[in-house]
Amino acid sequence: MTSSRAAMAVAAYVLAAIVWTAPASLSPTDTLPDVGDPVHLAYVMAWDAHQLVRAPLSLFDSNSFYPYPSSLAFGDHLLPEALMAAPVNWLTGNAALASNLALIASLTLSAFTMFLFARRITGLESAAFVAGFAYAFNSFTRTELLRIHVVNLQWWPLAF
């Protein structure tokens, strides 16, 4: 595989991820996919980024269910997603932007890791491109865009 073909595949997957996540991707600094779970998940990822540099051993001592201790353990800690979003959170302090960019990155990486896996199995870049597209952009990921931790699937193809 030439690096230019890999770059073209990644560019196509980024474009598809931006289209797939619209309208949040069109106004990423102040729009989330919904007012329910995405708001909570953006908060959790921002909390993780905040706490990782402030007091990493107290990561689970979130203020979300104050005064209960270790309240982040009441739900998903989202640490893998938070690590993807952390640089944006640290640089901008904008949880919505960080969450939206992490979602776009997750979809792009999901498609690309499946591309790499399928290419290794089939030896065909065209089939690998279609496999990556089908893996990341399907009815399941479309309905679960509200839950970044559910569509954070880029790790599975790497397991094989």
Question: What is the meaning of each model-derived region?
Answer:
Residues 114-136:
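Transmembrane-helix signature of polytopic, membrane-embedded enzymes
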